Each structure stands twice: as C-alpha cells, then as structure tokens.
Amino acid sequence: MEPVNQPVREAPVFERKKAGRVSPKRILFHVFTATLAVLLLYPVIWLFVSSFKESASIFTTSHSLIPDPFILSNYAEGWKGIAGQPFLTFIKNSAIIVGLSTIGAVMSSAVIAYGFARIPFKGKKFWFACMMGTLMLPHEVLMIPQYIMFAKLDWLNSFKPIVVPQFFGHAFFIFLMIQFIRTIPEELDEAARIDGCGRFACFWRIILPLIAPALATSAIFSFYWKWEELIQPLLYLNKPELYPVSLALKLFLDTESASNWGAMFAMSAVSLLPVILVFFLFQKYIVQGISTTGLK
C-alpha cells in the first residue's frame, strides 16, 4: 500500500499575525532591562572614560563620556606606583592574599561540608546551627577581639591575619557544598568503602571531583571578596610594601594637596580587569553551582 500524503494544515491568518506580533509587555520588559543595565554599567563606563582624562578636568567634565583631550599618561604614571612602590608590587600582594585565602577557604570548607553531610556524630544539628548562625554575625563585632588576638601573636604587618582564618572554613561555602554533597547518592560512598577506601580516600577520590561546580563557585566568590577587601588590610597592614591593590588606591588621594585622580582611576580600571575576566570565563560555574545546590 502506498502511504497517503495528507495535506499540511496551515494556521489561520489571524494566528500567524498573532504569533509574529510583539506584545507591549515584552517591549516594556526589554526597555526596562536595557535601562537597568545602562544604570548599573554607567559608573564603570564613567570610571574607564575618566582614566583617559586629565586630573583637573575629570570632575569639571563629568557629564561628558568623551575624553578631551584623550591621554594615556595616567596609566604610565599610575603604573610607576606611589609611596616608593611600583603598582606591580600591590598586584603581587593582592595575588598572594587572594590565592592563599581562596585555597584555604575552599579546601577547608569542603572537608567540613563532607563531615556534616556524610559523617554521623553527636550534636551534629547543634553544631550545624551554630555554624549557620555565624552567617548572621556582623564582621564588625569580631574586628576588635581578632585584632587584639593577632597583636598578641605578633601577626600585625603580615598577611597572616588575613589569610590564616580562611583555613578554618567559611559558613556560606560550607552550606553551599553540603547541599551539593547531599545530591550525590550515598551508594557511591558505600561502594568505595567496600573497595577499601577510608573516609579521607572516599572524600578525595569520590566526593571532591563530583562537587567541582560547588568548588568553582566558592573559589570565584572568595576571589571577588578578597580582591576588593579593604577593612582587613587597613587594620593589619601599615607598611606600603605590603599593601594590596584595594588599599594602595587610597594612596593616590591626598587630603593636604591635589589628589592624582587620573592615576587612581587608571589603576582602578586595571584592578577591575581580573574581576571582569574571571566573571566572563567562569560565570557558568556560578550559575551551575548555585542552581544545583537547590536540588535535593
């Protein structure tokens, strides 16, 4: 028997017009999101544009996004540094602080999260509640006790007060990883233990590779927070050769004479580049890590 070719029914004319029509709600939505994007990006755009202006004309021509004249000397002057230190020194200090803090926060949080998610112990719910309670504790409450403790340890004017506490875990990262580990079947742990894996081997060989999205998300957040942190370096570091980028930018401002706004804006733009680069390269891990932790 030959197959019968049935004629394809075309949609009515009014349905085709309705499908191709753009609703007013959709237009308003796109206009609103575009306006919001411009408002959010305008300060960053203004910063980059101002870095190519003369310091004397930055605020007198703040309404204009076209540098007149267009100069590059702000970048050369800012890169030479300030307080006897080249700006590359400040970038290296930030890289050391961010690198060590990120490694410490991510790895310690992963170990603690594995303990809460997989290992039964007495009072686990109580200690978990205490850990979550630290999220609601303002950091300012701990600043003075921590400063006194680090001063007695003779840790001032070093990276230790900024880096060492990160090796004791971060409550937000711990919670993020706990939710991720709970999505992994416990049968994998049981199979690994049957094959002779201990707790640490099970964590290192089975769990750690499977929670890579949560690790990446935590690392990105830790990078952001430590790269732009100002309060802790301001408290513990008094030597310019130890300043990170966030604290070094303050040196361009002089309350007694004219501030070098052009060099400060130029180096501020340079300091934003790693943040922007990390965001665009690893944004998929942020979405994947946060969205997956909501699954059960």
UniProtKB/Swiss-Prot annotation:
Signal peptide: none annotated. It is a multi-pass membrane protein. The keyword Hydrolase does not apply. One of its GO terms (biological process) is transmembrane transport. It is found in: Cell membrane. It comes from the Bacteria. SUPFAM superfamilies: MetI-like. The chain crosses the membrane at residues 27-47, 96-116, 126-146, 161-181, 206-226, 262-282. Its main location: membrane. Pfam families: BPD_transp_1. Residues 91-282 form the ABC transmembrane type-1 domain. Gene3D superfamilies: MetI-like. GO terms for cellular component: plasma membrane. Keywords: Cell membrane, Membrane, Transmembrane, Transmembrane helix, Transport. Part of a binding-protein-dependent transport system. Probably responsible for the translocation of the substrate across the membrane. Belongs to the binding-protein-dependent transport system permease family. MalFG subfamily. This is Probable ABC transporter permease protein YesQ. It comes from Bacillus subtilis (strain 168). The gene is yesQ.
